[in-house]
Amino acid sequence: MKLRYLNILKEKLGREPTFVELQAFSVMWSEHCGYSHTKKYIRRLPKTGFEGNAGVVNLDDYYSVAFKIESHNHPSAIEPYNGAATGVGGIIRDVLAMGARPTAIFDSLHMSRIIDGIIEGIADYGNSIGVPTVGGELRISSLYAHNPLVNVLAAGVVRNDMLVDSKASRPGQVIVIFGGATGRDGIHGASFASEDLTGDKATKLSIQVGDPFAEKMLIEAFLEMVEEGLVEGAQDLGAGGVLSATSELVAKGNLGAIVHLDRVPLREPDMEPWEILISESQERMAVVTSPQKASRILEIARKHLLFGDVVAEVIEEPVYRVMYRNDLVMEVPVQLLANAPEEDIVEYTPGKIPEFKRVEFEEVNAREVFEQYDHMVGTDTVVPPGFGAAVMRIKRDGGYSLVTHSRADLALQDTYWGTLIAVLESVRKTLSVGAEPLAITNCVNYGDPDVDPVGLSAMMTALKNACEFSGVPVASGNASLYNTYQGKPIPPTLVVGMLGKVNPQKVAKPKPSKVFAVGWNDFELEREKELWRAIRKLSEEGAFILSSSQLLTRTHVETFREYGLKIEVKLPEVRPAHQMVLVFSERTPVVDVPVKEIGTLSR
């Protein structure tokens, strides 16, 4: 904990904090949990949807999509397999906690080389729980040598009448924790994720260990509880464990809680109370319910071979009281726990758009990664990995699109414009599959905001301005700061996850045709919406469209080959730094933007 934060805590408590309180506040006031540097910026963003563990956006009168992106950067740097695997598990539970069945996973990976453990961790976890990994992006650069970025997006479909809130609503409710048993893994994981990676700061206890088969049981058990009307509120046990989940549930409802740590199911019997409180053991959920429903919840948990118990009561007094075998362990105001100190923000005024140079990341065939993922489990994947946005079908009717996108190569040259272009190019990719953009989730990956607060301000200002320009609001998000090694930061990397609404039956597939480059060589903000109108028009006419920041990659070539097609194009001598839009059509597109024939797609 920062010394300034410690002094604030002493002042608020009116005394010296106890050992247990220091452990608790070091977690809850960490950057990972408390968002001290970004909370004021986040309040400025245009928002949409039902907020909770994940953002929820309506597709129609019957269905909504819950979706969110999160980072597991620090754990994946230390222990690639478990770090990446538990990143998948955690974001799946965030979506699940809204009452949604998880239906899709996307990843955005930035590293200096393909780290097999990270790929295997994502693949093994996603494949084992039966949720398809339908796409993502892979960027290889030495700029991420010591700080790989592992950002994972999950989405799920929920009936509008089955949405679950993320708070307690009245005194007298109880909180049930169920899932895997609690051990010492992941203790102070949230604090570790808020630090520079230099030196020997990470220990085995900082890295969570996942069990995808327990996660699968957890998914089915929780959805059964929701279907029976037993769940009145829910929270994933992620960063901060029991402490974070139970305190957030009551803080959001302006209530309090009495937590009994001796009721938490353990797999290590000699754990200290503070260890039980902040352990980040995986595959656990907290459910708010009525006392009379608790026994049925525990019955369902046992049926699915999961542990569980009633661990807390919701009270009217706004305090967070922790007990262990009838001894008082901690008692503090619940809102003090939930509201970390906030750092002042820096106002940023953008300059003119620069003349970007192409910063080539190492080209890789991402199909070598995609092929480790099961993208067809569930049989709802309409557009598979390889071309950008994925399209998912909803069994009743309709569908949604997802895409992840980043432009660290541009943000490295100008943080503001590189970040803004990443959002606007995500709109291009979404429109390219015939979808209408609905909302975004985002992950702000940044270095040290104490050293360079201006860069963070540039990122957050660009995100706000891009959302306002495009009319696509934010539904959820995540910030991962202190991605530094020996004081050297990563490039400012905003990863955008964009959700769109689409009719899967009208999604174009590649077929033999001419290839056209559509749009301008230079990025011009005032003309961007003209390009969007052109993409929308051509998509409605049935053209297959590919938007790519590298024009044509090995991944695209190999993906066309999967369709039995061969692409031949003449690349321009000077390729633009921004994303190009390729239109595949038998005749020259008729649109109000520049069009140039550059090749063919043939059998």
Curated annotation (Swiss-Prot):
- Residues noted as binding ATP 1 in the record, renumbered to the chain: Y35, K68, N442, G477
Where, in this chain's numbering, is Mg(2+) 2 bound?
A: D94, D236
| Residues at which substrate binds | S71, H72, N73, H74, R93, G189, Q208, E280, S281, Q282, S480
UniProt xrefs under InterPro entries = PRibForGlyAmidine_synth_PurL, PurL_C, PurL_C_sf, PurL_linker, PurM-like_C_dom, PurM-like_C_sf, PurM-like_N, PurM-like_N_sf
E.C. numbers: 6.3.5.3
Q: Identify the metabolic or biological route this protein is part of.
A: Purine metabolism; IMP biosynthesis via de novo pathway; 5-amino-1-(5-phospho-D-ribosyl)imidazole from N(2)-formyl-N(1)-(5-phospho-D-ribosyl)glycinamide: step 1/2
Instruction: Name the keywords, alphabetized.
Output: ATP-binding, Cytoplasm, Ligase, Magnesium, Metal-binding, Nucleotide-binding, Purine biosynthesis
Q: Which residues form a coiled coil?
A: none
Select a single GO molecular function from the record's annotations and give it: magnesium ion binding
NCBIfam families recorded: FGAM_synth_II, PRK14090.1
The miscellaneous comment for this protein is: Purl possesses an auxiliary ATP Binding region which is not catalytic, but able to bind additional ATP. The conformational changes associated with its binding could have a regulatory role in formation of the PurLSQ complex.
Q: What is this protein called?
A: Phosphoribosylformylglycinamidine synthase subunit PurL
| Species for this entry | Thermotoga maritima (strain ATCC 43589 / DSM 3109 / JCM 10099 / NBRC 100826 / MSB8)
The opening ranks of the lineage are: Bacteria, Thermotogati, Thermotogota, Thermotogae, Thermotogales
